[in-house]
UniProtKB/Swiss-Prot annotation:
GO MF annotation: an example: neuropeptide hormone activity
Protein name per UniProt: Pro-opiomelanocortin-2
SMART domains: ACTH_domain, NPP, Op_neuropeptide
GO biological process: neuropeptide signaling pathway
Keywords (A to Z) from UniProt: Cleavage on pair of basic residues, Endorphin, Hormone, Secreted, Signal
């Protein structure tokens, strides 16, 4: 019997090591006991294993039992009731005034990392200030008939301006002188070789005829 127990000593030691490795707290409690410090005898080994097993079962909760019927602890109750506290349900106006500027600072800071910055509101037109103290009459103070006349004049003016521009274009030919590819003057067209008969100067031809007539007269005189 003793020989069989001695053969099982390595197995008991292995089981003891597994139980101790299950948790740091359990392992500390096991090794602090005097029975686990002296493992020279088989009786001490068995007692140490039973001690570690009992500590391990005490640490782990047993769900099949009636533990769910027990009232919760004060810490659990505080964690559950914290979101329902009056401080959490109070509106923002009743909160601490010191917390509101912090909230605004956080909000403004959160908008700074955007490229477009804070959202821009509707742009307002600048208010005209008259130094002479006389303000012009607004359109609202005018009667309905005068407002209609102003509206019709504003509508008709652009049409009249466009008609005048079209008439000017029809009267005068539009020349693209400011463009590089516009038509060059007649004197420089094709280098001056394609001039008409009227455009060319007739002086060389007249001098040629005069010379021929003078030579004929000289021959007749001789």
């Amino acid at each position: 019997m003793v020989r069989g127990v001695r053969m099982l000593c390595p197995a008991w030691l292995l089981a003891l090591a597994v139980l101790c490795a299950g948790g740091s707290e359990v392992r500390a409690q096991c090794w602090e006991d005097a029975r686990c410090r002296d493992l020279t005898t088989d009786e001490n080994i068995l007692n140490c294993i039973q001690l570690c097993r009992s500590d391990l079962t005490d640490e782990t909760p047993v769900y099949p039992g009636e533990s769910h019927l027990q009232p919760p602890s004060e810490l659990e109750q505080a964690e559950v009731l914290e979101p329902l506290s009056p401080a959490a349900l109070a509106p923002a106006e009743q909160m601490d005034p010191e917390s509101s500027p912090r909230h605004e600072l956080k909000r403004s800071y959160s908008m700074e990392h955007f490229r477009w910055g804070k959202p821009v509101g509707r742009k307002r037109r600048p208010i005209k200030v008259y130094t002479n103290g006389v303000e012009e009459e607004s359109a609202e103070s005018l009667p309905a008939e005068m407002r209609r006349e102003l509206a019709t004049n504003e509508v008709n003016h652009p049409q009249e301006d466009s008609a005048l521009i079209q008439q000017k274009k029809k009267d005068g030919s539009y020349k693209m002188k400011h463009f590089r590819w516009s038509s060059p003057p007649a004197g420089k067209r094709y280098g001056g070789f394609m001039k008409s008969w009227d455009e060319r100067s007739q002086k060389p031809l007249l001098t040629l005829f005069k010379n021929v007539i003078n030579k004929e007269h000289q021959k007749k005189d001789q």
